Amino acid sequence: MLQRIMRKLFIILFLFVCLSANAVEKKTNFSEEIFENAKASGKTIVVNSYEVWCGTCSKQTKILDQAEKEFKDIVFLSYEQSKNKNIAQKLGIKFWTTIVVYKGNDEVARVVGQTDKEIIYAAIQNGI
């Protein structure tokens, strides 16, 4: 009996560790003011919608963090979908694995659920 309880506790602990390892560590940095100013300036903007528990989002975040270091003139903004539904509604983003690229006022690329670095980078380069 005790062995069975210990096994269940171990499984629960293991699942918790696995989920925590995939958690997105990024915080919302989307600001309406920054977004609108970047659009008005004709800058390239990358908007990322995520959830902290989402494994796909975690992979996307790692790729976008790397891209942010490589593309210095691009504005990278992110927000947690469930906590910022107003942003999602304004930008027409329905899913939390969505990356949208703007060039000024124009949306130039949108990818959903993508974790392939080359495809994400190609979307970003559409805004350059």
What are these regions (language model features)?
Residues 91-100:
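Structural micro-motif
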Residues 103-128:
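Non-catalytic, surface beta->alpha helical segment in thiol-disulfide oxidoreductase systems
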Residues 56-70:
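Typically the conserved alpha-helix immediately C-terminal to a functionally engaged Cys/Sec
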Residues 1-9:
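Positively charged n-region of N-terminal signal peptides that target proteins for export
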Residues 15, 23-41, 126-128:
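N-terminal leader/targeting and pre-domain segments
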Residues 40-52:
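Short active-site neighborhood of thiol/selenol oxidoreductases, capturing the structured segment around
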Residues 9-18:
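Sec-dependent N-terminal signal peptides
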Residues 49, 68, 72-85:
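Thiol-based oxidoreductase modules, predominantly thioredoxin-like and allied folds used
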